[in-house]
Amino acid sequence: MYILQESLFSFEELQKLESKERLPIFFSALDLRPYAKELRSRSPRGADGHCRQGILRALLAAPLENISTFTGLHRRLDMDLRFRYQCGLRLDREAPSVATLSRVFADLTSKDLAKRLFEDLVTRCKQEGIIDGCHVAIDSAAIHAYEKKQPKRKSELTGNANWGAKFDSFGNKIKWFGYKLHLAVDTKSELPMALEVTPAHVHDGDLAPNLMEQVAVRTKVEFFVLDAGYDQLKNYETARNLKAQAIIPMNLRNEKEPPAGMMSNGTPCCSMGFPMTYWGAVGDILKFRCPHATGKVDCPLGMAACSSSNYGMVVKVDTTSDLRRYSTPHRDSKRWKELYHERTSVERCNARLKTFLTADAMHVWGIRKVTTHQYLNAIVLLASALAMAGHSSKAAA
């Protein structure tokens, strides 16, 4: 079963516009003055530099225009006067040099300004109703490094790029040298709410608790949706502590035998060995009924062998007795499957970042600069959503 979800904004629609039309709409959602102020030099000496707000605009426009290098951005600013003007840079002087662009990017990194801007935009999207935040999907994506490949043992000591491996949707094992981008995405809008960058060898499940906690600071989450790679008790416990439910398929590799009279997915079996019928939940208690009474099986003993009631035997399970095995709603129920299919939202968000933007076309090295690069790409998605929402409301007025 596949559920087609509609995004609240069309990033692809913004992409279809010509650059001269797209950039004014995109910049209309951004007030970069507070961030640009922190990028200005405090020294009274030296010549006046380029407008820091203009350079910050250019660095944000670069992923939108599929520009992945400082050299490419300098060339575009130098050759395209309309682009330079729309970024807010003066036309009566030369375009910012590659060194200037690189220096401002380094300042963004050292002061964590990209992260601050990202978090502020997430808050704005939440306030304007673009991000819902009740259902959040978490996953990681492979990011190839712009760094010299090193042996695994040596690269693990640097804390930067490393060798990683994972299986794709078709079961093929993929290896790469670089990083992992870990994303927490609102399933309704398909917009990022939190991100982390790690060396490629770091296991996905180790980052999930931190992402959950970051998201929970801004919104009340009901469900965290993750794939089987996150099937670890600590992820269920973290979701539980945040008053949410983790929706994660069980990874049955190396799985121990379930308790007697219980299936691996947490469904109890009747005395004849038939799986009982899930009949809803009240709080942390799951209710299961006799499968013969609900018409799921034709038991040779009927209901009388287990219960004198026409309702049939009832078994109640406390989900807190095993947070990993039991879930509310029950594993493999219709509602559980509907929630799990929302996980495709994070895959689509990853695809936008890597296909339409420059998340996987890096020309910076070191984990801190790589993280800034990923934040700039995520900011483009958030700003695009705000811009398109504002543009649509003006058009409707």
Residue ranges of model-derived segments:
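Short, positively charged, Gly/Tyr-enriched micro-motifs
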Residues: 48-116, 363, 368
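Basic, amphipathic alpha-helical segments enriched in Lys/Arg and hydrophobic/aromatic residues
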Residues: 328, 334-397
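Generic structural signal for hydrophobic core residues of well-folded globular domains
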Residues: 30, 59-65, 108, 343, ...
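Charged, often Cys/His-bearing segments associated with DNA-binding zinc-finger transcription factors
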Residues: 1-37, 300, 307, 323, ...
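Helix-centered, glycine/charged polyanion-binding patches within enzymatic domains
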Residues: 237-351
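Polybasic low-complexity intrinsically disordered regions
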Residues: 75, 98-241, 245-256
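Basic, short loop/linker segments at the boundary and entry of helix-turn-helix/winged-helix-like folds
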Residues: 20-61, 65, 100
